[in-house]
Curated annotation (Swiss-Prot):
Alphabetic keyword roster: Acyltransferase, Taxol biosynthesis, Transferase
Pathway annotation: Alkaloid biosynthesis; taxol biosynthesis; baccatin III from 10-deacetyl-2-debenzoylbaccatin III: step 1/2
Annotated organism of origin: Taxus cuspidata (Japanese yew)
InterPro entries assigned: CAT-like_dom_sf, Plant_acyltransferase
PANTHER family found in the cross-reference section: ACYL TRANSFERASE 4 (PTHR31147:SF1)
The protein, known as: 2-alpha-hydroxytaxane 2-O-benzoyltransferase
Length: 440
């Protein structure tokens, strides 16, 4: 039994409020590489900025109809080309909109710290086993809760947009919900700016070698928050050691890599790697224009021998991560092709870790009149062994009722959550204690 139940009130197809040209749009090579559906849950509290009688479902439904005028691909359908690529047919049919009502208040969500089956009700999931031509590219569900707050569940096809692009759409939809005539940032398609050869230098091939074992322990969703105060302690220690600046993202990625390698007791003679996406919009010879909402990511990858990684310091891991980001950008700009090594091809599934960062994609800034989202979370389909969510860490902003820091949403075997958190605390406390002692 879940924490709450949701009743669907209405499901409709929302078309753009103005007709747009019916045409065919080609996708970029990166778009074709990033196929699949992604779900986002955005939580909004009741607000004194709007009247009690204000209806978020009605407001967002109308805003969706308006914003689709500027994002016509999301009102269309995908179709296969003769060579196996995808392209968008701008039909003007529309996106799916669902209005729903939950029988409890927002507190039952518990900040999405752990997975609960009832969360599945917050995103309307059309069947995925349909022909690609029949698949809706955007679904928006507004679920009101008894406290007056609500959740917006967004589902989009990743081939049409990356995370930053869908964040741009949601922000634009919020602006139109608040009375603006058009989005403040003009959406730009221009997929021809990404050339077929570009994909060769963005390191997507790292994912080609990830093969899970047959007997894979079920992953669960768990979380922890690292305060910015503690992150800044670590950054200060690193600055004292090497006069090098590291971002909060780099610090947390390094902590995760070390803690996970230790807690999973990976043999010292094996290799481990950590992969994370990098926005490449400004790395092209002609930087992609602001408003470009297609996929524009590359994959940085740091790899090392377990013995060397664990015998080294946090600074050592940080330098590997920073070098991997630099190498991705330099190789892309200089057109230096790096082919996967035999170590890549033979690496065990459990030795590969993925990290992602949703904090600054625009999801939190989508304001439909009730203020910014107070919490954001992914919503994966209920599959026990989905490869993409094994050994994965996602960075989110901590919810308003938490300490100010980075929330780490983790997907790993249940038996490993506690050992991992212990290793994280041990490493963090080492540097916090160092700073505290220096103040004495």
């Amino acid at each position: 039994m879940g924490r709450f139940n949701v009743d669907m009130i209405e499901r409709v197809i929302v078309a753009p409020c103005l007709q747009s040209p019916k045409n065919i749009l080609h996708l970029s090579p990166i778009d074709n590489k990033t196929r699949g559906l992604t779900n986002i849950l955005s939580v909004y509290n009741a607000s004194q900025r709007v009247s009690v009688s204000a209806d978020p479902a009605k407001t967002i439904r109308e805003a969706l109809s308006k914003v689709l005028v500027y994002y016509p691909p999301f009102a269309g359908r995908l179709r296969n080309t003769e060579n196996g690529d995808l392209e968008v047919e701008c039909t003007g049919e529309g996106a799916v909109f669902v209005e729903a009502m939950a029988d409890n208040d927002l507190s039952v969500l518990q900040d999405f710290n752990e997975y609960d089956p009832s969360f599945q009700q917050l995103v309307f999931n059309l069947r995925e086993d349909v022909n690609i031509e029949d698949l809706h590219l955007l679904t928006v569900q507004v679920t009101r809760f008894t406290c007056g707050g609500f959740v917006v569940g967004t589902r989009f096809h990743h081939s049409v947009s990356d995370g930053k692009g869908i964040g741009q759409l949601l922000k634009g939809m919020g602006e139109m919900a608040r009375g603006e005539f058009k989005p403040s940032l003009e959406p730009i398609w221009n997929r021809e700016m990404v050339k077929p050869e570009d994909i060769m230098y963005l390191q997507f091939d790292h994912f080609d070698f990830i093969h899970p074992p047959l007997n894979l322990e079920k992953s669960i969703q768990a979380s922890m928050v690292i305060s910015f105060e503690r992150i800044n302690y670590i950054k200060r220690c690193m600055m004292e050691e090497c006069k090098e600046f590291f971002s909060a993202f780099e610090v947390v990625v390094a902590l995760i890599w070390l803690a996970r390698t230790k807690s999973f007791r990976i043999p010292p003679n094996e290799y481990v790697k950590i992969i994370f996406p990098i926005d490449m919009r400004n790395s092209f010879d002609s930087p992609l224009p602001k408003g470009y909402y297609g996929n524009a990511i590359g994959n940085a990858c740091a790899m090392d021998n377990v013995k060397d990684l664990l015998n080294g310091s946090l600074l050592y891991a940080l330098m590997l991560i920073k070098k991997s980001k630099f190498a991705l950008n330099e190789n892309f700009k200089s057109r230096i092709l790096t082919k996967p090594s035999t170590l890549d091809a033979n690496m065990k599934h459990e030795n590969v870790v993925g990290c992602g960062d949703w904090r600054n994609l625009g999801f939190y800034e989508a304001d439909f009149g009730w203020g910014n989202a107070v919490n954001v979370s992914p919503m994966q389909q209920q599959r026990e062994h989905e490869l993409a969510m094994q050994n994965y860490f996602l960075f989110l902003r901590s919810a308003k009722n938490m300490i100010d820091g980075i929330k780490i949403l983790m997907f790993m075997p249940a038996s490993m959550v506690k050992p991992f958190k212990i290793e994280m605390e041990v490493t963090i406390n080492k540097y916090v204690a160092k700073i505290c002692n220096s103040k004495l």
